[in-house]
């Protein structure tokens, strides 16, 4: 299994893991858990879920997640 996309900085350090879903798929805890499992090996500081209708972004802080109100700009990653 693998994630759908990773955003990297110019030093090729991973900044954000992205999991895309179909518009008919609700962004549930199960979907979030899938991204979190992928991140166990990658250790990316941000997780994003998107189904084309809504997006959820969470910052990973010491094995806890802080949900963000909006998708950060690339320059702010």
In which residue ranges do the predicted regions lie?
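A short, conserved, highly charged catalytic patch centered on acidic carboxylates
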Residues: 1-46, 53-77
């Amino acid at each position: 299994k693998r994630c759908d996309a990773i955003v990297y900085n110019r030093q090729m350090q991973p900044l954000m893991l992205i999991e895309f879903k179909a518009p008919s798929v609700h962004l549930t805890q199960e979907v979030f858990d899938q991204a979190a499992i992928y991140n166990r090996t990658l250790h990316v500081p941000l997780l994003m879920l998107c189904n084309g209708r809504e997006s959820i972004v969470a910052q990973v802080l010491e094995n806890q997640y802080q949900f963000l109100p909006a998708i950060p700009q690339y320059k702010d990653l």
